[in-house]
């Protein structure tokens, strides 16, 4: 192997395999763009985003790590969420959970 070389197995990599997902419509009711990162607890996003908030407790966007989704003012779009893994504890963000899910 050459230093810095990647040794990638053939085939596709499936993100978040085996985790529960949820598709829902989200609308930006505000007057400014809102961007949500890949690992942000969706239940706690900006209140100007309108959606079924209770259904999203313990979930995040089902997108690649380090990426984000941007919601322009007045825009509605479908997103897919995935369960938060690991210890299923949420701290910080908007402070709405601060503990176990």
Curated annotation (Swiss-Prot):
Q: What class of enzyme is it?
A: hydrolase
Gene3D superfamilies in UniProt:
Urease, beta subunit
Q: Name one GO cellular component term.
A: urease complex
| Locations listed in the record | Cytoplasm
Give, as in the UniProt entry, the pathway in which the protein acts.
Nitrogen metabolism; urea degradation; CO(2) and NH(3) from urea (urease route): step 1/1
Q: Cross-referenced InterPro entries, in alphabetical order?
A: Urease_beta-like, Urease_betasu_sf, Urease_subunit
Superkingdom is Bacteria
GO MF, any single term: urease activity
**Entry's EC annotation:** 3.5.1.5
What are the alphabetically sorted keywords of the record? Cytoplasm, Hydrolase
Q: Which reactions are catalysed by this chain?
A: urea + 2 H2O + H(+) = hydrogencarbonate + 2 NH4(+)
Q: Which family does it belong to?
A: Belongs to the urease beta subunit family.
Q: What is this protein called?
A: Urease subunit beta
In its UniProt entry, the species of origin is given as: Pseudomonas aeruginosa (strain ATCC 15692 / DSM 22644 / CIP 104116 / JCM 14847 / LMG 12228 / 1C / PRS 101 / PAO1)
What's the name of its gene? ureB
